[in-house]
Amino acid sequence: MKKRVLSLLLCFVLAAGLLSVCAPPAQAGTIADAFELFIKQPGQIKKLFNREVAHGDCGPAGDEASVHYKIYEVTNPTVVQDNPFLQQIWQIHDYREDAQYYGVYIFGDGKMADYAATGQKAPWMGNVEVTEYNDKGQVLGTTVVENLGEEYLALAYIADGTDEEWDGRTERYSGVTNVGAYAFKDCRYLTCMFLNDDITTISERAFYKDEYLSAINMPRKLELIDKYAFYGCDTLTFVRARNCSRLRRIEDHAFYSCTMLAELRLPEGLTYIGPWAFAWDRILGQEDTTLGLPSSLQTISTGAFAFVNHHKNLNIPANVTSIGDYAFMCDYYMNNLTFSPGDKKLTIGKAAFFGDNHMKSVDLSNRVAQIDRCAFAGCEMLEEAYFGDKIDTIEGRAFTSLDNAMKIAVEGVLNGILRPDDTEQNADQAGDISTALNMIAKVTKLKRAVFKNDPAKSICAAADSNRSFPDDCVVYYPQGSYTWLAELKDDGTWQGYKTGFWHGDHIAAFTDTVVAPTCTEQGYTLSLIHI
């Protein structure tokens, strides 16, 4: 029901063009300093571990005893005065002062187990037998806590090299190197998680739908964030991975629908962002309006940043060769889109920037070779676009509006990804959002398409219902382009579009009906414009 309400709210907001209503939580800025202290002093978590109530093994199959866990009673931070960060976090949520919460401490040598098999759960999940104590700390016996991980696990700590007591003796352990698949899935009250710096993998669905997960550090040796790892972590506010120099891949849906994620720091070395990885992180970028994509990045996959509303400035790095379908769809407040120069050709996918409503000009002259169908459809403020010598194909409706086929395609995609584990509500939600998209899928105000060199080899003509540009758009081409001159009509049109001459860096001549562009874009600026 919660997601349903959010979906409907978004639809009305989209229709009104008022996505600013999705403001960040008031606490986002106020807990930033405390979060830094938490990362620097992970012992804050261990201080809240009280009496041990259960323990066991959680190593991989065949080597279970290589990694161990201990479950502790947790001193409720709402009544502890020396832990301001956890007090702030816990006050946001509806923790009960009369409830007993728990923490899990994991230590050992190497990998912990994965729990992806059907019916398999981590030992701290489900019904757990724990030691029961009286008020004097004396053991009374045991009792079963139903759904301990799902309802009462509040803190977790995965240790690096450490000396720990096990089976009556102290042993040295080298450290745990991963977070197992599904290990903390659906831990609703898991608030703070510390990962040691030797962890290389955060596995599939490791923290899936941990609604209250507010603080987690990114290990320095991290190499992979697997699919759905942080899906639906609604109160996750910071992802600071800039020091994770070994991180290469963030897989599909990894941070999907982290609706309060306000700050994202990605490291140099990252090459791949998977499908829908950060989609629906609706306030991402409001704390810092520039999305800093690392220069090492090569692939931005389908829907990677769809419905992220606050990136005012976006630069596509020089090594990126593919921007997937819907990649930045409905990034409503995007003002400036730039492309770093380089030698690698770049393809922009279907509806990749659809509905990015605050761009007035876009310079695609650096590396852009193919612009797919509806790539910039619905960009209602867009007035001019510039193209370079790499451009080969501009597909139908690239700069106009969605057609019915594309609307159906978008709805079909949303139907498949909105709620992967709850298909019953998908169709309704997808339909609601599709209706909202129709409200902003209007023909753009684009008046100038300026080609720095020879125009695209493939383009949809103005008379075509799937025209690449609005039919009143003026297409400027280089003077002396024999290909164009041969195809130019007697009335001065090309493919049905009005035309003007372009000298490669300034306008040389215009027809009487053409208004001169401002010539202010990079690579086109000259002090003299001849009319």
Predicted regions and their residues:
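Positively charged n-region of N-terminal signal peptides that target proteins for export
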Residues: M1-V5
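Structural signature of tandem-repeat unit edges
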Residues: V104-D109, N127-N178, R188-T201, E211-L224, ...
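Sec-dependent signal peptide cleavage junction
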Residues: L19-F35
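Disulfide-bonded cysteine-rich modules in secreted/extracellular proteins
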Residues: E52-P60, H503-Y524
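Consensus positions within tandem repeat domains that build extended binding/scaffold surfaces
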Residues: G180-Y182, E204-A206, K227-A229, D252-A254, ...
